[in-house]
């Protein structure tokens, strides 16, 4: 987050900076505490306005995947894997929930 920025504004900015994705920000989806590194990761639902991605210089690759094609072993962060898994489970159940998770 930057000064004078809300968490959702920060998430939208990071999404643009990292993936170059044009999104319509949705609601909070997961809050993941990572105490061993003194971090809290917030993930939001969002809708892509365009499937065109323009990743920033810190990003090696940004692509869209069908759920069955997600390269789980290649995801950089455990919090991303957990969030994607929970989202796919919620979507299959027909109800998107907010998840509060503590990683130990």
Predicted regions and their residues:
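Unchanged
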Residues: 1-28, 32-86, 90-99, 103-104
